[in-house]
Amino acid sequence: MIEPLLLGIVLGLIPVTLAGLFVAAYLQYKRGNDLGME
């Protein structure tokens, strides 16, 4: 049986991790465009 606390932590971290990766990729893409790099 999975502990509810552990399950809550995992379910909480997944969207945060995905959001962090998305923001990092967006900032890198935007910075690349600002520098004129394709």
From Swiss-Prot:
Signal sequence region: none
GO BP terms, alphabetized: cytochrome complex assembly; photosynthesis
GO cellular component: cytochrome b6f complex; plasma membrane-derived thylakoid membrane
GO molecular function: electron transporter, transferring electrons within cytochrome b6/f complex of photosystem II activity
Primary localization: membrane
Membrane topology qualifier: Single-pass membrane protein
Similarity section: Belongs to the PetG family.
UniProt subunit comment: The 4 large subunits of the cytochrome b6-f complex are cytochrome b6, subunit IV (17 kDa polypeptide, PetD), cytochrome f and the Rieske protein, while the 4 small subunits are PetG, PetL, PetM and PetN. The complex functions as a dimer.
Job of this protein: Component of the cytochrome b6-f complex, which mediates electron transfer between photosystem II (PSII) and photosystem I (PSI), cyclic electron flow around PSI, and state transitions. PetG is required for either the stability or assembly of the cytochrome b6-f complex.
HAMAP family xref list: Cytb6_f_PetG (MF_00432)
Protein name, entry field: Cytochrome b6-f complex subunit 5
Source species taxonomy: Bacteria, Bacillati, Cyanobacteriota, Cyanophyceae, Oscillatoriophycideae
Protein's gene: petG
